[in-house]
């Protein structure tokens, strides 16, 4: 069985306050208000039952659970854990289910202390039968901070008290001061209330302040800074500019992609490129301007501008110095410069090789290739020592 401890602390005036706050510790096992004793509540015999809060018309109505409706369960000859443990196991001192704290509705207007006490007597008199007997059953009252009185009645009468119109709660009372066995409130002795002293509510005020502090801490949102940081990050993601990303696919292409880039100057010891390379974009004139040309008799690359783009000048090797009288490579129209194949330039510290792939030079004399056509005289269009004997090649 669960044991619940609540505090006896009901809010002070004004009278139209929405709720009463208890800081007076007591157990809760009163019957359901404004309803007949039901079999469900009669069978639920907890040691200290919880009370539930239900808002009605802006007011808090707390209802405790009831124990046996006909006889006190403390007097059960066969107590067991299915109904309620014996009295020796009760944890709250003073909670004997004979002392009851009766909480009533706040009085209307600004009644005096005596008028408030008189209303308590009349309320209890509806149950015990007379005001005189009611006076003798009351052991404490509260006319400040909260409105309640303590009544020494049986558990059966506590059920009837709950059915009254002006009664909010009827709860088992317990000691507020265990050492002095004091239930708290303003003592009511022999049918009379002692003069009021603020000390009677000092303990309640302290307990009420502690309860308010606990409520304030519980109501404060947790992880406040973390929540603000999360909101700030979400706003940045929603409205801020997209983050800068590096370009996809790697670095940008080099400036001369798609064409033949000139080699770096003096790379590998070669001569620098001609000064006017790439300035004249027109193709160079063909070697034989006066008539048709024929392909060379060997597998050398085609002549300049012959049916397609000009191949590299040094295609697989080093050509002779004056390649058929063709213009030098300074007006190549974007073609790669000399020595693109890695071969040595003309007269690179040595004489070019005597034979170009084992075939005679391409542009020495075209007397045998033309058909009666006047060919220009290329007296000096052969490499020196072409045949190895020191004489020019004779066709």
Swiss-Prot record:
InterPro entries: MORF/ORRM1/DAG-like (IPR039206), MORF/ORRM1/DAG-like_MORF (IPR054059). It holds the Pfam family MORF_dom. Residues 240-300, 335-355 have a biased composition (Pro residues). It is found in: Mitochondrion; Plastid, Chloroplast. Disruption phenotype: Dwarf plants. Residues 211-236 have a biased composition (Basic and acidic residues). It comes from the Eukaryota. Keywords: Chloroplast, Mitochondrion, mRNA processing, Plastid, Transit peptide. GO terms for cellular component: chloroplast; cytosol; mitochondrion. Its main location: mitochondrion. GO terms for molecular function: cobalt ion binding; mRNA binding; protein dimerization activity; protein homodimerization activity. GO terms for biological process: cytidine to uridine editing; mitochondrial mRNA modification; mRNA processing; RNA modification. Residues 313-334, 356-385 have a biased composition (Low complexity). Residues 211-395 are annotated as: Disordered. Interacts with protoporphyrinogen oxidase 1 PPOX1. Interacts with PCMP-H52/MEF10. Homodimer and heterodimers with MORF1/RIP8, MORF2/RIP2, MORF3/RIP3, MORF4/RIP4, MORF5/RIP5, MORF6/RIP6 and MORF7/RIP7. Interacts with RBG3/ORRM3. Interacts with PCMP-A2/PMD1. Interacts with ORRM1 and VAT3/OZ1. Interacts with PCMP-H13/MEF35. Interacts with RBG5/ORRM4. Interacts with ORRM6. Belongs to the MORF family. This is Multiple organellar RNA editing factor 8, chloroplastic/mitochondrial. It comes from Arabidopsis thaliana.
